[in-house]
A protein has these predicted regions:
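Metal-dependent peptidase/peptidase-like ectodomains
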Residues: 1-71, 83, 129-172
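His/Asp/Glu-rich mid-to-C-terminal helical/loop segments that flank catalytic regions of hydrolases
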Residues: 51-119
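A structural signal for alpha-helix termini and helix-coil/disorder junctions
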Residues: 16, 100-104, 124
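Catalytic-domain carbohydrate-binding cleft regions of carbohydrate-active enzymes
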Residues: 34-37, 110-117, 124-126
Length: 173
């Protein structure tokens, strides 16, 4: 899982380290995400969860947050039952992500992916509520933010916005 604005970073790291194309899902407000909405973009909740087909093949039940280890949060949850290759891969994923978040010219956050998600959600809500409620003002606000972000990105690409100014704007968002 990851927030929309982190998809480019997550995609590049997962492809480089794991050789896989990530499947994106917006994080649930659960577990380590209980404190979502404090201004931190998040990613990698359930990153090594066993795929449903493999879990079914093994006869395991669904558990979240542990990669599919059915001993999770029991007295049997000890290091020797962990899949060391998965642990090493996860460590590499986390370290490369941290490196890219801390050693950058431009902060690797794409806020326009978030505005696209907001716009899509507003369209779905408008379709669901029909004429009972008008979400046009909210949609206009998202559109205005997206246009401002497009100008910022164009300024970055064209060199008229410095890395310092771009990163300050991205952090402030």
């Amino acid at each position: 899982t990851c927030m929309a604005e982190m998809k480019p970073l997550v995609k590049s790291v997962i492809e480089e380290i794991a050789g896989q194309t990530p499947i994106f899902k917006r994080p649930n407000q659960a577990g380590d995400y209980s404190f979502n909405n404090i201004g931190l973009s998040s990613f990698y909740m359930l990153s090594s969860t066993m795929p449903d087909d493999i879990r079914a093949e093994k006869g395991y039940y669904a558990v979240s947050g542990c990669g599919g280890n059915i001993a999770w949060h029991t007295e049997n949850d000890t290091l020797e039952i962990a899949d060391k290759e998965v642990l090493l891969r996860d460590i590499r994923i986390y370290l490369l992500s941290i490196l890219r978040l801390t050693q950058f010219k431009f902060l690797p956050v794409d806020w326009r992916m978030l505005t696209a998600e907001f716009a899509e959600t507003l369209q779905e809500y408008q379709a669901a509520c029909g004429d009972a409620f008008d979400l046009a003002p909210a949609s206009a606000g998202v559109g205005a933010l997206d246009a401002a972000l497009e100008r910022l990105d164009a300024g970055i690409a064209g060199g008229s916005v410095s890395a310092e100014a771009a990163n300050a704007a991205r952090r402030d968002l």
